[in-house]
């Protein structure tokens, strides 16, 4: 197989992996109200896909997963969102850890 064919195959595999991660994320959002354990499993599958293909999880998905206990974070249910000193502070109610994400202030 030539270099170009390998590159095209790798790009195709990564595109499929990203599609699957987004689909699992949507399923986790919809299933959380009735089956929170199922949404935890979907998060685990998202992590497995990203590790298997050696690629990062998209930022929108990554910000909804606890970095310590890998829980699916839902604002108001198991996560608390606060604005503090130019950061969005996300507190996981399951493990008690906090994640901080910077945001730009409007001038």
From Swiss-Prot:
List the keywords (alphabetical).
Answer: Cytoplasm, Endonuclease, Hydrolase, Metal-binding, Nuclease, tRNA processing, Zinc
Q: Name one GO biological process term.
A: tRNA 5'-leader removal
Show the catalytic activity. Answer: Endonucleolytic cleavage of RNA, removing 5'-extranucleotides from tRNA precursor
What InterPro entries does this protein's entry cite? RNP4, Rpr2/Snm1/Rpp21
EC number(s) given by UniProt? 3.1.26.5
A Pfam family (short name) is: Rpr2
Query: Where does it live in the cell?
Result: Cytoplasm
The residues the record assigns to binding Zn(2+) are 66, 69, 92, 95
Group of enzyme by EC: hydrolase
- Which coenzyme or cofactor does it need? Zn(2+)
Determine if Nuclease is one of this entry's keywords.
yes
Annotated GO molecular function terms are: ribonuclease P activity; zinc ion binding
Which note does the record give on the cofactor? Binds 1 zinc ion per subunit.
Cellular component GO terms, alphabetical:
cytoplasm; ribonuclease P complex
PANTHER family from the entry? RIBONUCLEASE P PROTEIN SUBUNIT P21, RIBONUCLEASE P SUBUNIT P21
Q: What does this protein do?
A: Part of ribonuclease P, a protein complex that generates mature tRNA molecules by cleaving their 5'-ends.
Self-association and partners: Consists of a catalytic RNA component and at least 4-5 protein subunits.
Family statement drawn from the similarity comment of this UniProt entry: Belongs to the eukaryotic/archaeal RNase P protein component 4 family.
Instruction: Specify the protein name.
Output: Ribonuclease P protein component 4
**What is the organism of origin for this protein?**
Methanosarcina barkeri (strain Fusaro / DSM 804)
Encoded by which gene? rnp4
